[in-house]
Amino acid sequence: MNQAGRDAEDRALALLEKRGLKLVARNWHCRGGEIDLIMRDGDALVFVEVRHRGGSRFGGAADSITAAKQRKLLLAAEVYLSSHNIDSPCRFDAVVSVGGDAPQWLKNVITQ
């Protein structure tokens, strides 16, 4: 991951913690993929994809969460839940930013 990506993750984490979410894991990897941030929001476990683009020339940051990426996130989340024996409500959010703009938190970006 490059420095811009790390900075975007740091800003995303700060935003979510400011909104009351608690960090569970960061950059969690499994054979099928990676989850940038795993947070706790009350009873819900929140899987967060962080996306940053330097500019909007090729579309916004949210546009880069393709159907293939969504499938990888779902698979990684299933592996995480299974390997940690977790049975709680969960959702998939994204924190997106373009250029120097403030990050935006998008809830429920993937519906199962």
From Swiss-Prot:
A Pfam family it matches: UPF0102
InterPro entries: Restrct_endonuc-II-like (IPR011335), tRNA_endonuc-like_dom_sf (IPR011856), UPF0102_YraN-like (IPR003509)
Domain of life: Bacteria
Stretches that traverse the bilayer: none
GO molecular function, one term: nucleic acid binding
Family designation: Belongs to the UPF0102 family.
Protein name: UPF0102 protein CV_0654
